[in-house]
Amino acid sequence: MSTFNCVADDVKLGKNVRLSKFINLYGCEIQDDTKIGAFVEIQKNATVGRRCKISSHTFICEGVTIEDNVFIGHGVMFTNDSYPRSTTAAGQMQTEADWKVEPTVIRKGASIGSGATILPNLEIGENAIVGAGAVVTKSVPANAIVAGNPAKVLRFVESQPAVEEDEAPIPFLDLIAPHRELENELTDAFRHSLRTAGFVGGPVVEKFEEAFATFSDAKHSIAVSSGTDALRFAIMACGVQPGDVVVTVPNTFIATTEAISQARAIPEFVDIDEQTYNMSVVMLQRYLEKQCIRDRSGRLVSLRSGRPVTAVIPIHLYGQMADMDGILELAESYGLIVIEDACQAHGAEYFSRKHNRWIKAGTMGKAAAFSFYPGKNLGACGEGGAVTTDDSNIATKVKCLRDHGQVKKYYHDMEGYNGRLDAIQAGILQAKLPHVAAWNAQRRERAAEYNRLMTGEEAVRIPYEPSWSRAVYHLYVVRTNNREEMIAHLKKTGIGTGVHYPVPLHLQRAYASLSYSAGDFPVTESVTPEILSLPMFPQLTAFQQARVVREVVSFARESGSRPAEFIETTLA
C-alpha cells in the first residue's frame, strides 16, 4: 500500500484488492479481487463487491452498494442527497445528525462510463450500461443502455449468452420486455398521478382519448374501463333496443356476446370464413336472405327468435379485419347498424375497394370497441377499453353511459354505469401509444418469418392474409389436427402456446337458451379443434422462432398431422 493513501483502520479489504495511489477510504468495504484506481474516495457504509474495477478520480459516497463484476469509469460521481444544503432551515450549519442518506445500488455486471453522475435513491440494473457523461436521474432497467442528460434508454443488450438460448423457455407472450423498455416513461406516468392526485378522469384521460382518436383516424375516442364495456356502451349508444337481435359469429371470446346480452339484446350467429376466421360475407347474406323476413311494418325480423334484427358486429379476430366492404354493403341494403369489435386490432388496416384506400380498424362501422387488456397490442397495466366513432351524438351517449348517466356532476339524464378508465391506466397507455406502430410492424415481421419457415409444410396450415388486409398479428394462429398432443409436446420443450378459442360460443353452456346445436356452424366447428396460437410478441427473436418452427414441424411430421380440408360455403 502506498504511503500517499489514506486508508482508515475501519476499512474492510478482501483478498487480492489492488489499490493505486492517492486514494481516500474510510468505513467502507471492498471485497475480493477488486481494483481501485488513483484519486478515488470511498466513504463509510459504502460497499464494493468482488472483481470490480473502480477507475481514477471517482467519488463513491456513503450509502452506495456496488455488487460484483461492476466497471466504474473515470471521474464518476455518486450522490446521496436529493436536496443538498450547507445549512438547516434554522440557518445553522448542517451536522451529520441533519443528514439523511439516500441509498444507491449498482447491480452485478453493470458498467458506468467516465464522467457520469448518479443521483441518489435509485438502482442501476444487472448488466446495464450507463454512457459516458450521462446524468442518471431514475433507476435503469437490467440490460438497458442509457445515455444523455437526463439519461434515457437507447436499447437493450442480451441478458444471457446466445449459446444458452436453445434451452431457455419461450413464452407464449412476453409482457416483461416491453415494460422493461419503457420503464422510465411508465414510472413517470404513475408518479404524475401520485403527485397530482389525478386518479379518475381529468386531463390525463382526455389527452389519451385525443391521441388514440388520432391513432385510429377517428373523430372521437371515449376511454372506458374495459373492452367489454366499450362494446356494450357502443351497442347501447348506437340505438340497439332491448330485445333486438345483433348478428355476430360464434368464433370469438365470450365478451362479444356478453356485451350484446348485457345491453339486453339477443345474439344470433353466422358462420365464419375458413381462411380468415372472420365473419363470412356469404354466410351473412344467407342468414339475411333465408333466416329473416320483413314484417308488416317493414322491419327485418329473425325467424329464429321472432325479434327485429338491427345490428351486425364483425370481429377483427387475431388482429385481422373482417371483409368490411361486403359486410357494410349488406348492412346498408338491410338497414342494419355495423359496430366493429376491434378489441384485437389496434392499428389494423383494410383496403376498401369502394373507397379505394386503406382504412384503419375502428372507423368503418358506426362505432367500434377496443380493449386495452395487458396482452393486447396496446395494453394497460390492468383493464381498459375505448369506443371510437365519427358520430358526436354516439360519443356523447357513451360518455354519459360510462359515468352513471351524468351530463354534469350529480345531474343524471339516465341510469348509467361505472365504466370509466382511471387516470393511471390512461397515463400508461399514453406512454405506450407512440410505440404501437413500431410494435405492430415487428409483429408483421415475425409473422412473415413464421410464414417463410413453414410455407410448404402440409402438416401445418399457416394464417391467410388477403391482399386487402394489413393484419397486426395480435395472435399468430396455425391449424393442426392433433392440437392437444402438439401443445403437450411444445410444453415439454419449453414453448408456450394458447388456444383462441377451444369451444365456439353457440356450444357454450352459457348460451344453451339460444337453442343452437352441434353442426349449426360447420366451419367454426371444424376450425376450433385445430387452431393453435404460437408465441407472438414484438421482442420474439429469429432464434426463438426457428426453434418454435423446428419443434412444431418435426412433431407434426412424425405424428402425421394434417389440417382438415376446407369446407366450401355457398348461398344454397
Which residue ranges define each predicted feature?
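Phosphate-binding glycine-rich loop
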Residues: 198-245, 259-262, 269-271, 293-303, ...
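Conserved active-site segment immediately N-terminal to the catalytic lysine
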Residues: 340-379, 408-413
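PLP-dependent aminotransferase-like
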Residues: 236, 240-317, 321-333, 337-342, ...
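Short beta-strand-to-turn element immediately C-terminal to the catalytic PLP-Schiff-base lysine
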Residues: 147, 154-156, 371, 385-390, ...
